[in-house]
Amino acid sequence: MKNVEFSLERGQRLKMPARKLREIVSPNQGNKLAVVEDELPRVPPALAANKRLAVETRTSSNGTLCGSLDLTSARLYHQPLLESPPASKKSDFSKDAVVRQLPLNKTEENNAPKANDIFISQYTMGQKDALRTVLKQKAQSMPVFKAVKVHLFEDTSTEKNTVAQETETPPNRIDSATTVAAATAAAIATAAPLIKVQSDLEAKVNCVGELLTKLQETDKQLQRVTEHQASVQSKQEKVHCHDHDKQMNAFMEQHIRHLEKLQQQQIDIQTHFIDAALKASSLQLGMSTSRAVGKYSGKLGSPSVGSSVFSHNTFVSKRVPLSEDTDFDGQKSPLETPAPRRFAPVPVSRDGKITKRESPTEEKENMEMNSPKGNVRLLEQVLNSNECLTRKTESSDITSLTQPKMGWNLEKRDSTETLHSQIFPSSEERGTAQVPVPKYNDVVHDLGQKKQASDMLQIKQSPVTLRLSDHPHNPALLQTTNTRSVLKDAAKILRGVQNNKKVLEENLEAIVRAKDGAAMYSFINALATNREMSEKIRIRKQVDEWIKIISAEIQDELMRKDYEQKRFDPKNQRNKKALTMSRDIKANNQEKTVNRSVIPRSHYQKQTQEQFTSPPVRNLPASGPQKERSGLLKSATTLQDEDYMLQIYGKPVYQGHRSTLKKGPYLRFSSPSPKAKPQRPRVIELVKGTKVKSAKTQTDFHAASRMKMDSKIQHPITALPHADQQYMVSPSREMPTVSGTLEGHLIPMAILLGQTQSNSDSMPPAGVTVNKPRPVTVTTSIPPASRKGNAGVKKPNVAIVEMKSEKKDPPQLSVQILPSVDIDSVSYSSTDGASSPPSPKEASLPPLHTWIQTPDFMKVDEEEVPLPGTNFDEVIDVIQEEEKRDEIPECSAPMLEFNRSVKVVPTKYNGPSFPPVVSAYHPTTDILDKVIERKETLENSLIQWVEQEIMSRIISGLFPLQQQARLDASVSVSEASEPSASDIVAGTSSGALQRMVDARVPVNSDMVSHFVNEALTETIAVMLADREAERQRAAATSVPGDLSGTETNLLARVCAPVATPQPTPPCSPSPVREHVRVKTPDSSPCESDPDAASSIKEIRVEKGSDMPAVMLVSTPTRTPVATPPPAAALTPTLSETSIDKLKLSSPELPKPWDSGDLPLDEENPNSLQELPHPRAVVMSVANEEPESVDFSAQPAPPEPAPSAPLPEGTKAPSLQRVPSSGSSTLENTLSTVTETETLDRHISEGEILFSCGQNLATKRPGDLFLMNINDSLSSTLQDALEMEDDPPSEGQVIRRPHKKRHEDAIVALLTKQQRELLVSQQEEDLDNSVGELSEGQRLVLKAAEDISAGPSGQMLPPTSPAEPSYQHADPRLVLQQSDMASGNICEDLCASHGPMSLRELELQPDSNLILPITHTTTAVSDGNLPEAAEDFSQYQQKQDSDIKQVEHKPIQRHLTSVRNKPDSTLSQHQGGPADLLLIAHVSPARMSVTLPSANLEDCSQSLSTSSMHGGTESSGTDTF
């Protein structure tokens, strides 16, 4: 309802807004109701009573009766009628329009007419439409009922029809007809209940509708009743309050009269005494008094009234302070806290009439002053009401006092009362001033308290009157002047009375004050105890509101007076300004004193600000000065000077957090109060993504002054506060006409496009992370034309801006509108943190959060600390910037982080040299190319890794499998390949390969397995061919002595115990395996370095020849010889490294570092020095490889004897082949290491190259290979290990107690192993899975492996110094245990344990196991080696027991299965047996020798060490 008005009293109770009524009305009605409302806005008041009847009769203007629907409409309109304003006339009612605006009061008063109003109101919504709709609805409802009945009848009729049809159909005998009839009958039968239900539902719905209408009617009636009751109650309460007020007034009047009587009595008594004192003149005085009675009879009322007013006002003052104290818990001295006075207290003359005259005149003046505003002010109302009370009391007092008594007495009383009026004028005015809340005087006053106070006043007044009575006689005495003595006495008396009067006044005031205070406190306590807090709070709020209103009025009045004075007295404007200011100050001081406890400080401050600044426009009409000031404000707004802009928009973002925070002309978020260190939004401009600037540089306190716009002006767009921001895009304009405040005004912004985040490889669009909620202005300054490297087609620039607000307020992102920028000019590298890596190598770069900002073309002084990228020179090295971004000082201002989500494993870095040169700005088209390149590089690197690690792992497994294949060619090979593939997938998904892929993208096991299988097929074929070739070459080139020498060189590192070489003779099948291996690899030479691997084998053989003395070496030589060729095939890069290491034995080998000497010999995998006896080194990445060297350095004396048999041509070649297989495993690991190098990748120092699952020997600083890889590598062979009877569970790390085992124990274990080798070999044929080595084949565990394997291997009794390494530890057990320890690296080690005879070596091509043993020992290399030796001895003993069982198995699998394991496993297998042999032969001290890191790399044996470190988590790593 547009015109709905609410009476103040009833408006509060209205619960239904007019709009709802309108909404409820049916649409048909609603259309015309508005028209009707316009026509007849009001309903006659008499009609309000008829509302109820209207529901029943519902006669429309058309005369049609309204149905139940009419009732609902009536209900709908009923309440609007209540809400409707008072009906104008009945004539209006005669109109058909229904007026919903009947005033609530009249509606209730006139209930009879309400019914008619209701009808009308129903049709007011559009009576005709309502009637039509009602009729339509009724018509519809009737047809519905009819339809329902019809349906019911139709059901029967349909049944009859169906029967008829059935009867008809038989003659026709048409099946279709019967079917149709049946269908119709069924449909009818089914429809009939539905129709019934529908009709029932309709009937029920109608009933429910009627019930609802009734309920609504009853509800409305109940509302009316409740409203009426509430109104009646309120009226009763009001009446009660008024009655209470009246009673109070009457009581006060009675009180005053009583007091006056008492005063009169006292005065009479005093007069009698005075008469006695003035005997002679008493008669004359009486005459004069009789005359004076007529003169002063009019006056008597006023002085008496003054006294009465005083007494009354004292009570009032009591009451008011009580109310104030209850309301404001803190003001306890009512007399001292008067409300602000409208006028200064006027000194009261001795004549009471003057006081009465002056106060009314002043009141009139004040009223006149207030009258111009047209508002009766609250203070004036209070004062006027108080004055009315005083006037009433005055009238009553006059009536009581005008009765003349003894004239002189009356005159005396008059004079005394005048004195009272003089005494109490201030109290009177205080009383009036202290009644800001006249209403509550009645509520708050306590009659008993007031009686006591009045009694006290009477008691105190009596002495005053007694002495004052003397004073009234003085004028009479002056008139008589019969005797000067009398006059003198009177003068004395007068002076004494005056003095007494002063003292009494002071005392009286003090007493009254104390009594009032006591009464007030008691009364407050009573109120506090009895009153509810809600009431107190309500009163307090009310008083606060009144005080605010009064203070506003006072201020306005003062303003008005000041303005009037300025207008009327321009000469004195200055003086009057000073006066007005002083008045303002005084008024403020009064307000402070009065209201400080009441008004909250903030309010007071606002008041003061409003007073001395432009006063805010209030509901009160603005005074002249206010209008002037408002006019000034308007002019200021129109001008939009800087201050105004600052107010509206806050500071420009570039101004940062200047001290003039709130004066900044640009938008602020919440215009936060300045803080100790205000947060500066960090604005990062993105141009070319190369120059990074934080907002600190732009919004620095000093930067604002230094900001110089370079080629183009940046227009900071002020962001609207929070949600109000709307953006308009006007790309054609560099600066939008509107600053972004308009709705739909999008801001064209040149934002660099980030690489699409299509997949893990692609870079996500730069995320602008605003850390601080400060408004962030993303000012993308367009690079000058010179900056634009490529003037390509301008394309819309898009950036995804993520606002991360650390604070509750989301930062308003004020986006600067910039002309569309050529994206090509801006390199997307801003998102990447660098231009997309020029080469696929960059793809592997670890994800960097690059703080890249477009170069600020704003010239910033050099004072600023350049953030990374601030210099374009710096921009060139984007990667350096990325490194520096960590160094970027964190500013409180929000920073824009462009997060490149592609997370490449930092472990492998195939990218270019580390500060790469930034490529020229790439057009957007290049971005996709770079993304694709990056993807390809990642895929290639992934494939390479898969090839390297998996091939190293699987090939290492394949060789043992092939060895088995020699026994069980097809079955074992298939088994090995299958578990390897599954393991590869598992390993890649688990960790190694996953690193190469975006962290978010899971590795597809199918894809990985596919790549792995393909790569493996190729690489394995090549590697196997290379191994065969290399083994054959090694066999041909080196005599067994040469082999021994080769192994000595290889084992020079390993210090393989000589005794180990004695292989169990039954190893003959292994050579067959070797031949099989050789045949397969021969077909395809290793990509990496088959020749190098073969050369490595040869070198080892040469070294072996160089160190032929070590018999054991010859056995290791065999292993290494076999190892190198496949190793090269496995990982050509690693093979290069291994070749380099192998070449370390020969000075020719290039240093793996591709640079000068390694900082440490250990790190140098090729270091030749480590070959003989590398100094014991704590297990480092390098140690793993050097361990084999260490053991080689520790040749076991029994070994030379086997080495002698090794020279035997037949056995030697087989042995060489077997060792070559072992060495091939080593070299495979080495080749794996080199493989990356073969890829011609430059390995950064921080880069770790892993073949998948390959445990590379950890190169110490530079080439650290994660030992974790062993797990992945071992995972491929886990199944095979589980297939084996490995005592440790698959993946189980068996930490053997580092028991100090002596060489004797190791030798015994080796001997046991040797004895068991035959058995193990026999068992191998039976038990070994493709990837597994028979226990006889298993290499003796390294010391670390022994430790991991535990005492089982170590417990093996030494057979012979040479044998124990092969035979004592069941290579399977030892290596498996070591593998378990080393992450199942050695799981498949089936090399024969303990020394083997040359015959055995020849028979068992896998005599290579000696080397793996040696490597195992090497893995133990470091201070732990003695412990490792002990543990190894224990482990060998265990293995000896196991090997005794397994020894009979052919040794053929020795190293081959090791290779199935991760390269580290291979190295362990290769080095393991040799190492074990070495360990067996070498004292624990030798075993403790740490392998140099270089040797570790050089020998895949180091891989065994790595397997010890990483794979044998507990054994290798823990041992060290």
Curated annotation (Swiss-Prot):
Subcellular location: Cytoplasm, Cytoskeleton, Microtubule organizing center, Centrosome; Photoreceptor inner segment; Cytoplasm, Cytoskeleton, Microtubule organizing center, Centrosome, Centriole; Cytoplasm, Cytoskeleton, Cilium basal body
Knockout-associated phenotype: Deficient mice die during organogenesis, lack cilia, and have randomized left-right patterning, pericardial edema and hemorrhages.
Annotated coiled-coil segments of the chain: 487-519
Region annotation (Required for centrosomal localization) ranges: 485-572
Annotated InterPro entries: TALPID3
Location of region: Disordered: 322-370, 568-632, 759-793, 826-848, 1060-1093, 1145-1170, 1184-1230, 1500-1520
Biased composition (Pro residues): 1060-1069, 1195-1205
Keyword vocabulary terms for this entry: Cell projection, Cilium biogenesis/degradation, Coiled coil, Cytoplasm, Cytoskeleton, Phosphoprotein
Any one GO biological process: cilium assembly
Ranges annotated as biased composition (Polar residues): 587-596, 605-616, 826-836, 1217-1230
Residue positions, PTM Phosphoserine: 426, 1068, 1083
Compositional bias (Basic and acidic residues): 350-367
Subunit structure: Interacts with CEP120. Interacts with CCP110, CEP290, CEP97, KIF24.
Entry similarity comment: Belongs to the TALPID3 family.
General function of this protein: Required for ciliogenesis and sonic hedgehog/SHH signaling. Required for the centrosomal recruitment of RAB8A and for the targeting of centriole satellite proteins to centrosomes such as of PCM1. May play a role in early ciliogenesis in the disappearance of centriolar satellites that preceeds ciliary vesicle formation. Involved in regulation of cell intracellular organization. Involved in regulation of cell polarity. Required for asymmetrical localization of CEP120 to daughter centrioles.
PANTHER family, alphabetized: KIAA0586 PROTEIN, PROTEIN TALPID3
The name this protein goes by in its record: Protein TALPID3
Source species: Mus musculus
Lineage of the organism: Eukaryota, Metazoa, Chordata, Craniata, Vertebrata
Record gene name: Talpid3
